């Protein structure tokens, strides 16, 4: 949605009986221009028909991976090339799906476009999504491929030691399929994409006009997919290693993190939140680049922290939080994820995130 379309829609929300002449007068534009903008709003689904019937069912769309997570937690210090005694936990995961579930737990109306197999794991993902409030009606379900699986082994500190993923099914989210979802994408308030989907598909999404695109770079290898068109994204959340891939700057300290942010902003990204892990977050937009330290958090499982952080950024954006407030809310959401053995914490609520932010001294 363009800024002008947003202005017109706000006027219509306040007064559904307002005329095009009155809108033109208030915004100091031609009535013919108002007519064009209203036609575009109807095409995008924000206005449902004549009489200015407004579609108030705003939603966030997430496009990305969904899979089954199998995690191993050692009971003692992790010994490589040896059998370790520990605990195995299976849960639903995938960067896109995780972001969508965190958003649903934050009471955000969310749709998920992903690819799953018509198998036991795929049906489990569909059932859970329905129960938690994630709309997967636009996802791809195939009978000739398996639902993605992600296996991770954590060390004694709760950090990931090694992981294996089989996510070939994400390649099924191809250009033709995503083009068939063009209206759903363009009608979203925010569209979140992760780099598990093919580069060609990411390029098609990035070229869509008037779509607020949030990007999760996922990993250093997958971040390379978007390096050449990173400036098409509104908001990105790389870690220091992914930022190095995108900028060529070795992010070994705060100054270099700020330089990396500056490079990304100069490429066209509107907002950058560069995660430095336990060292905090460097964030910036056209008004400047800043840093917030991360208060000490007890880490049980670091796997889902980045997904929770991005969900916190999306929640903050659609609720008009400032950059600083967005970073703090996202950090508190990540802290809740860090303290949970599950990839998605069942304590992820708006109230709990705000409480955690206060406990951490972020507000």
Predicted regions and their residues:
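Conserved phosphate-binding/catalytic region of the ribokinase-like
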Residues: 1-20, 26-27, 31-32, 39-55, ...
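Glycine-rich phosphate/adenosyl-contacting loop at the front of the ribokinase-like
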Residues: 3-4, 8-10, 18-22, 26, ...
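Short gly/ser/thr-rich secondary-structure transition/capping motifs
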Residues: 43-45, 171-176, 215-221
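Conserved N-terminal subdomain of the carbohydrate kinase-like
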Residues: 56-57, 75, 80-85, 105-189, ...
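Short, conserved phosphate/pyrophosphate- and ester-handling motifs at nucleotide-, phospho-/glycolipid
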Residues: 103, 239, 306
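Hydrophobic anchor at the start of a short beta-strand
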Residues: 109-110, 136-137, 213, 272, ...
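Conserved beta-alpha-beta core of the PfkB/ribokinase-like small-molecule kinase fold
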Residues: 190-259, 280
């Amino acid at each position: 949605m363009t800024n002008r379309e947003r202005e017109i829609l706000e006027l219509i929300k306040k007064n559904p009986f307002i005329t095009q002449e009155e809108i033109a007068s208030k915004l100091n534009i031609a009535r013919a221009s108002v007519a064009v903008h209203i036609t575009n709003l109807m095409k995008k689904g924000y206005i449902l028909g004549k009489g200015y019937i407004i579609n108030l069912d705003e939603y966030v769309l997430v496009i990305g991976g969904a899979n089954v997570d199998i995690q191993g937690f050692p009971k003692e210090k992790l010994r490589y090339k040896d059998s370790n005694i520990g605990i195995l936990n299976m849960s639903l995961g995938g960067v896109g799906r995780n972001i969508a579930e965190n958003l649903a737990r934050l009471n955000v109306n969310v749709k998920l476009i992903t690819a799953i197999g018509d198998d036991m794991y795929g049906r489990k993902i569909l059932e859970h999504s329905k129960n938690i409030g994630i709309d997967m009606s636009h996802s791809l379900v195939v009978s000739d491929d398996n639902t993605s699986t992600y296996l991770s082994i954590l060390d004694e500190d709760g950090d990931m030691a090694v992981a294996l993923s089989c996510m070939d099914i994400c390649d099924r989210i191809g250009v033709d399929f995503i083009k068939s979802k063009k209206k759903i994408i363009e009608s979203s308030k925010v569209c979140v994409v992760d780099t598990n989907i093919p580069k060609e598909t990411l390029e098609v999404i990035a070229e869509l006009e008037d779509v607020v695109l949030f990007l999760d770079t996922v990993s250093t290898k997958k971040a390379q997919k978007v390096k050449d068109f990173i400036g098409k994204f509104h908001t990105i959340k790389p870690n220091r290693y992914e930022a190095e891939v995108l900028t060529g700057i070795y992010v070994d300290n705060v100054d270099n993190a700020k330089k990396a942010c500056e490079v990304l902003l100069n490429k066209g990204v509107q907002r950058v939140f560069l995660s430095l892990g336990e060292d905090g977050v460097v964030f910036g937009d056209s008004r400047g680049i800043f840093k917030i330290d991360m208060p000490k958090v007890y880490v049980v499982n670091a796997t889902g922290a980045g997904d929770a952080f991005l969900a916190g950024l999306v929640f903050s954006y659609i609720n008009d939080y400032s950059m600083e407030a967005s970073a703090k809310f996202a950090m508190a959401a990540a802290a809740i994820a860090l303290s949970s053995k599950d990839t998605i914490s069942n304590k992820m609520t708006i109230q709990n995130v705000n409480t955690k932010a206060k406990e951490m001294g972020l507000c």
